[in-house]
């Protein structure tokens, strides 16, 4: 024990503070969690080559990546067929999925293929295999009862023809309805359009005869209904209604009484002014009422 300790001390003194053996020992004492993996020797050189690569030919210059992407996107925008094809393919895939769901056909359960991944420990690999196996067993137990030997009865040709005819009829009805709507719109546009002949002269703007429902009618100057205009217009004077005999007799009596009262008033005025009595006996014309 003492010899071993003395030998270690001698070796420590011989090594010295700056010897490479001591530095190597310190590197070995470092914990494993703080070690950094050394970079690959050719990695940085490749990166430098990628960044600072020179053109192969000085007379030719390659198109930048961004510019190539812009050119490709412009070409796709100019070609509308590609967008239509993508939409059509998506519609077909969606239709097939719906048909499979409607038929109730379930796909076969995929058998997992086990392969240990890079950097995966044995315990993690075994745990992953167990989980996938349990998942496959769960799916197989809960799967619906399948009878592959029983084939579905093919549809009769008459049913297929009926379905085809019904589809064609619906399509034709839809086309006919669209044509009728277009014709109605065209007719409405033609009715709203005024055709002006060549050389036609318009002296005044058109008169609007239709009035809104809640509008208040106001008389415009020059168009007011005047009494004089009504009287002068032919047929404007209203004809008196034919009165009965009793009504005519009452009117005659009232007129005679008014005439007698007027005569008495005039005679009284003459007496007050001292006129001669023979003038009062002169017959005067009756006033016309």
Swiss-Prot record:
Keywords: Chromosome, Coiled coil, Phosphoprotein
UniProt key word Transferase: no
Region (Disordered): 1-64, 149-184, 204-225, 265-289
InterPro entries registered for this protein in UniProt: CCDC137
Coiled-coil portions: 155-197, 247-273
Gene Ontology molecular function: RNA binding
Basic residues composition-biased segments: 162-177
Localization of this protein: Chromosome
PANTHER family according to UniProt: COILED-COIL DOMAIN-CONTAINING PROTEIN 137 (PTHR21838:SF2)
Protein name: Coiled-coil domain-containing protein 137
Lineage: Eukaryota, Metazoa, Chordata, Craniata, Vertebrata
Gene that produces this protein: CCDC137
């Amino acid at each position: 024990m003492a010899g071993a300790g003395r030998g270690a001390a001698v070796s420590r003194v011989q090594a010295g503070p700056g010897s490479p053996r001591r530095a190597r020992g310190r590197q070995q004492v470092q914990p494993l969690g703080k070690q950094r993996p050394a970079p690959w020797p050719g990695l940085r050189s490749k990166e430098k080559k990628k960044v600072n690569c020179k053109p192969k030919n000085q007379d030719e210059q390659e198109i930048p990546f961004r510019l190539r992407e812009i050119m490709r996107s412009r070409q796709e925008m100019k070609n509308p067929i590609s967008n239509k094809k993508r939409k059509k393919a998506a519609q077909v895939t969606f239709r097939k999925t719906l048909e499979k769901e409607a038929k109730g056909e379930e796909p076969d359960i995929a058998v997992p293929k086990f392969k240990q991944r890079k950097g995966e420990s044995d315990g993690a690999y075994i745990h992953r295999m167990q989980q996938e196996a349990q998942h496959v067993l769960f799916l197989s137990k809960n799967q619906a009862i399948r009878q592959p030997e029983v084939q579905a009865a093919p549809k009769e040709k008459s049913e297929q023809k009926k379905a085809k005819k019904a589809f064609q009829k619906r399509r034709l009805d839809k086309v006919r309805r669209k044509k009728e709507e277009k014709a109605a719109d065209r007719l409405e546009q033609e009715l709203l359009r005024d055709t002006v002949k060549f050389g036609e002269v318009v002296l005044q703007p058109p008169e609007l005869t239709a009035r809104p429902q809640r509008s208040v009618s106001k008389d415009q100057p020059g168009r007011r209904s005047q009494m004089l205009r009504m009287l002068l217009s032919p047929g404007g004077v209203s004809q008196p209604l034919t009165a009965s005999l009793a009504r005519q007799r009452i009117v005659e009596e009232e007129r005679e009484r008014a005439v007698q009262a007027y005569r008495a008033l005039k005679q009284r005025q003459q007496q007050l002014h001292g006129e001669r009595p023979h003038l009062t006996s002169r017959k005067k014309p009756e006033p016309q009422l």
